[in-house]
Regions:
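Beta-strand/loop substructures that line and gate deep hydrophobic ligand-binding cavities in soluble
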Residues: 82-132
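Structural motif
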Residues: 13, 75-77, 105-107
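Glycine-rich portal/gate segments that line the openings of hydrophobic small-molecule binding cavities
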Residues: 41-84
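Intrinsic-disorder/low-complexity, polar/charged segments enriched in Ser/Thr/Lys/Arg/Asp/Glu/Gln
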Residues: 3-9, 16, 40, 52, ...
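Hydrophobic pocket/interface hotspot
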Residues: 19, 29, 53, 72, ...
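Hydrophobic ligand-binding cavity/cleft-lining segments
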Residues: 1-39
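Short, highly charged C-terminal tails/helix-capping segments
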Residues: 42, 141-148
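Short amphipathic alpha-helical signal-transduction/dimerization elements
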Residues: 24, 135-143
Length: 148
């Protein structure tokens, strides 16, 4: 059964456009989404409503990987991303839903994340910690203004 829910709120010093791109470009998401100690391989990403994605996180220490994939349900450029995803592992059953809302503010972008349907075998607090780590890495990707 899948009942866990995680909510996060951040303000990043970057435009909504830059953050939106970071969620939908394979090279960018592979850099920031995996929590500390994990690498990411993006196998497929078709970032359009009805499009699908597939990727895996590999624990660098143990070598174990968890593959997952999903479908983009709603994409409002620079404002909202909503997608479903599920793990390949039958021990991690159920479909999760994630909603990312972006809102411009005076110093950058307000970011709200809601992830629902987290499998019961994944402690919600561990999922929350993973998202916190990922969002720190996202900030390091999108906040710097580096000239060419």
């Amino acid at each position: 059964m899948a009942t866990g829910t995680v909510r996060l709120h951040r303000v990043l010093r970057a435009s909504p456009e830059r953050i939106y791109r970071a969620f939908l470009e394979p090279d960018a998401i592979a850099k920031w989404l995996p929590p500390y100690g994990f690498t990411c391989q993006v196998d497929h990403m078709d970032a359009r409503v009805g499009g699908t994605f597939r990727m895996s996180f590999r624990n660098f220490g143990t070598g174990n990987a968890h593959a997952f994939g999903g479908e983009y349900l709603e994409l409002v450029p620079f404002e909202k991303i909503r997608y479903s995803d599920r793990f390949d592992d039958p021990n991690l059953p159920g479909k999760m839903l994630a909603t990312i809302a972006l809102r411009p503010v005076s110093c950058g972008t307000e970011l709200d994340i809601l992830q629902e349907g987290i499998p019961d075998v994944i402690p919600t607090e561990m999922c929350y910690l993973g998202w916190q780590e990922s969002l720190l890495q996202l900030a390091k990707l999108v906040e710097p203004e580096i000239p060419d």
